[in-house]
Swiss-Prot record:
Protein name: UPF0319 protein VSAL_I2129
Region forming the signal peptide: 1-21
Protein family: Belongs to the UPF0319 family.
PANTHER family named among the record's database cross-references: UPF0319 PROTEIN YCCT
Keyword annotations: Signal
Cysteine-cysteine disulfides: none
Matches recorded under HAMAP family: UPF0319
Length: 208
């Protein structure tokens, strides 16, 4: 009887620890978090706080963001926006924060686009390893449908690509500025990638 009680208590403890184990990502005000694991997110923040937080399950995650430091020049606020950055990391039960260089002018902050010298650190000030890339297409910065372009990026072999979430993204209805949805764009994308024989089979299937 005591053994069963001990076993039950142990299972309850393990369940409790498993349920409470998670990642907390702290996002400063100068970071524009666009997507997490290919989805838009809502951050938790308080009225007087300069940071926001996001809870994630333990494991591998992909974040997409811009770095937008703000500089005061007279009565004006000058914002320097970086290119869109894709990053993939793995963590377990850690509080993670962004760390960026300290820039004292907009001109110096523009160097971030070249250096990409930021870090992720946990609650013990230890570095969280990550892979990163700019979300660009043929050298041009993406501006319209980030989720669609990210879905294409995730089909590549880049170390920052996030394979496991592709199906979720390609089936989600997301309208872009031209009124096209992501499913339609993905169909066009894969049609262009296919050989002639596959294209003919596709056209036959949709005409029947």
């Amino acid at each position: 009887m005591k053994f069963h009680s001990f076993l039950a208590a142990g299972l309850c403890l393990l369940t409790s620890l498993s349920a409470s184990a998670s990642i907390q990502l702290t996002v400063p005000s100068e970071v524009e978090l666009l997507l997490v694991d290919s989805q838009e997110v809502k951050l938790d923040s308080s009225f007087f706080s300069t940071t926001s937080t996001l809870k994630l399950d333990d494991g591998e995650h992909q974040i997409v963001f811009r770095y937008n430091p703000v500089f005061k020049q007279g009565k004006d606020n000058i914002i320097v926006s970086s290119d869109i950055i894709v990053s993939k990391f793995t963590a377990t039960n850690q509080d993670i924060s962004f760390v960026f260089p300290s820039y004292n002018s907009p001109e110096k902050a523009k160097a971030f686009n070249t250096d990409l010298n930021w870090e992720l650190k946990d609650q013990n000030d230890k570095n969280i390893p990550f892979a990163q890339a700019k979300l660009v297409y043929d050298g041009v910065q993406i501006g319209h449908n980030i989720q669609f372009e990210l879905a294409k990026f995730n089909t590549t072999e880049h170390v920052a690509a996030f394979k496991q979430d592709m199906i979720t993204v390609t089936h989600k209805e997301i309208k872009n500025e031209k009124g096209e949805n992501t499913a339609e764009q993905m169909l066009n994308y894969w049609y262009e990638k296919a050989d002639k024989e596959t294209q003919e089979r596709f056209k036959t299937s949709i005409s029947n």
